[in-house]
């Protein structure tokens, strides 16, 4: 049997005579296949595979192909509707009798018995045949085109162009004699023009609308009259009309009538459409045969820009990956490759931007595309509309709204098929789509993978289009569409898109000024703007940085921006290299300086206009030059006003803000963001004045080497300090914890306040903490939800009034609003219940956090207002807010008016009862007619002459009086006003909610801090071994910083995870009175040196964020910065070797470390010659000991350093203890004790590590011998050199002292210099 074929997503014109949406990009007639008429009226022309495979989605095994490959149709999925099956003899087609020349069926070929073999040969080639598909229970028409004698199989080409290799003797077939389908087509084609004239003249709804109705069946998007195209496309439209006649055999009047009826229904839903869409999105492409093509240029999809290293020094350009990223392959290549390469040369070798610049032009803009006029002329209106959007946004995937579906065409369809797993629709043009309800899911998938998405929405309905054409005389046949959103990693705002990722997604705008742009050795001046769109937070700052961009590296490592905005070709090479090195594949946007990336003056002007519009300020406060006049800056936020008055000190920060606002304006987020933006100052990161900071500095190297947020395995959270401490229950708490870890406290009093709070939240108060966590456990991300409420009152982007959406967005908004109110109420109640702990213990920080009116706002009155305003449960269920009386003045007034008219109608009823003398007269409603006065038939003679008879039935008549008609008109208008007020009530209530924005944000902030404090209290329970509250003390009386730990464990590593029993704690003491400030640490490889260094650093961080430390005792004077040089790695993307990377990090430490810093150097000097490495290591160590005089650890395998510093009181020699045993072949076996022990270790025992690594025994034994030889040589040369040096030094001293022979002493000094070099060389 033939392989399963992908089901065809066709629809029968009997259900809807409109063509598929694939005709939106219909090909010209010259390239289209001749359509074959179909006699079937079936609702869906989907062919089920003939195979008996019980799972129709799983194709049956394909038969062996014939030796001669049949010529396949290069366009198996043309624009023509899928073929309709021919009915079997027992189920004749309802339209079959309408053919003027009925076909002659030469008998049905039954399935032959197994003992009978029917064979066919060349005699049936060219004949018409019908093949029965058992699972479809239908017949399909085709013709035999080829016979393979070797296989004994015939190739049958069906009417839709698909081919199948069959053994006709084993198939159920019918042989057809009579009029060929081609003749039938030609006969029908003669009547096409007349039909088309009737259809288009009688109904102005255009073919584009037909396309969209076919998909949504409730959209009526009325787009394009494809028949009125130029050249060959007219012929195509005529042929399409012929298909309608052949498949429907309907009278022209019936066609027009049905079309008119369908286009009048805007919200109709089609079951057939659902089946079609389900097939195109869910089912996989089966055995559909595709023609293969040797195409040279293939259109690719669009991937996001990524940061790549500059190709050479001074080159700041970055490669924008666009068309080259998603290469067609497999079926897509065979199906679309040839067409794409032939039709779109302007996307390949003839590529130009909108200003007709070639890619080789230095000002070439890859975001835009020049469309050749000849190409544009051949486009229909709908096609032209799509290409106009695409040509301006070539770096984005276009979600093009057509009815209830978002469509992806051409190169964007390849992205949808690849990344969203959406199947291509039928047709030669790449095309796929998905329903409106899947918008959030699909757009998040693309954005998370690094794509930019342009959302094009309909802003006009078909009825509005028709009305516009009548009123203005416009000839437009396409509904209006507008760009309503640009969604990227940094502009995700929808709650559904952010549910799985509580981390802040920062969009970072960065600019640079000063001498560093021309002088590589000069210091850098940066302006930075960080925007978290989801929480409406804007962080602004300007700072100076060293030539290695250390502060910028720290900022990038902490914030990890997902998107970067920078002025094109402005940043220095060092800055570009830092971005490459310290980011994780962000989306990079290069804006044109000044026109797109604004300077400070332009920024103040543009932002000022926005705030003036928000505050309803008159525009006259600005001069024609765009400068603020008088006190025009008073409406700006305080922070922006201060930056504007600082002149040069704030100009770069304002410029960065300008770049961010311009970018957000393209995404329709600028005004909604600024309206309720929360401005913050950039955390101080100038390392030269670190003592002015309120926080400890953890630079990029420390964050990475200590694995604070990212592990070294895969960059995830597992095994990091953040993962260990993160037991937060709220999303805002998780984000706050990351901030605390990135910037631990430096102020002693603030640290103690946190420690007090953490201590109180456990122990006997643990039940209160658990209850607090339980209350918050089901809350959504309240910080983002509140921000979304703030932005929802701005009718812009997809929230715009003109946007045509079929999803009930109003109901969704009401439900989110109620969720926000309930969340705020829950947070307030949780904080209130936690206040009970203050009765037992006191903590300044907790008292401040839990006292209403201080950090905790008093929101009880606000919550009561909204509870009294409407029923939350009813509103959440219905999606409509019905306000209680007194909640909304406008609605109350409308209700009162309605009641007045209803009261007047009741009064009028009483009057009529009295007039006619019958109390049984009453109002009734019949159909849409209300307030019909129902009068008994016996009183018909007494009815006044001005009564209007509306209807009657046996025994009664129904009337309208003039008064009733007048009151009904007024009542209808009053009800309309009431409904209008009801529709806007939710927006007014949200507006009142936004009036208290500071309260809601304070509530979230207080709740988040309490959540983090409880998390720190709980996290200490997971430590292995004991824990203690660290003692934070000032320096000793002589001003020497100190650190002391007893029984210090590791906060992250546990013995059970290591699989070696319990973790070995250690005692550490550095600094303080009469104590060495540095530990020179030696020991065997794998002895635990690096682990000890890390655990000390992590313990200091824990102590200064207010958490407990895994130790018996821990005391430290505050550390202002932790400087870490640890691990071996290179930065190839930044052009740095391992050794250069180590020295670069060390250079930063040398220039930035202070007396209060903690310096950790792990095996500095490796990666180069031993002499060079040891010389550098000793020089660096000496600098920290003698010049900086800070606390620190220096681990090394240069054992000569231990000899040199064994008498230095500022250095404590220690090693990681081990036991040595004799192994096989003289190889020493080392047992690691992991205990910090005083004294130096004589060896590193590297051969033991080689043994553990599994090196062969003969290699190990040879290594032992070589090791002994090197040690013997070192000892001999060492003793020999010492004797020679001693003799020479005595000679020099004697010679210089006597001063008798200057030339001799000079020669002696030269010899001493030579001997010193020899000594250094031999001792290494």
Curated annotation (Swiss-Prot):
GO terms for molecular function: ATP binding; ATP-dependent DNA damage sensor activity; damaged DNA binding; mismatched DNA binding. Residues 1-114, 197-294 are annotated as: Disordered. Residues 27-55, 71-83 have a biased composition (Low complexity). Residues 225-235, 262-273 have a biased composition (Basic and acidic residues). Its main location: nucleus. Residues 56-67 have a biased composition (Pro residues). GO terms for cellular component: nucleus. Residues 201-224, 236-261 have a biased composition (Acidic residues). The keyword DNA damage applies. Keywords: ATP-binding, DNA damage, DNA repair, DNA-binding, Nucleotide-binding, Nucleus. ATP binds at residues 1083-1090. Induction: By UV-B. Gene3D superfamilies: 1.10.1420.10, 2.30.30.140, DNA repair protein MutS, domain I (3.40.1170.10), MutS, connector domain (3.30.420.110), P-loop containing nucleotide triphosphate hydrolases (3.40.50.300). GO terms for biological process: mismatch repair; pyrimidine dimer repair. Heterodimer consisting of MSH2-MSH6 (MutS alpha). Component of the post-replicative DNA mismatch repair system (MMR). Forms the heterodimer MutS alpha (MSH2-MSH6 heterodimer) which binds to DNA mismatches thereby initiating DNA repair. MutS alpha recognizes single base mismatches and trinucleotide insertion-deletion loops (IDL) in the DNA. Is involved in a UV-B-induced DNA damage response pathway. Belongs to the DNA mismatch repair MutS family. This is DNA mismatch repair protein MSH6. It comes from Arabidopsis thaliana.
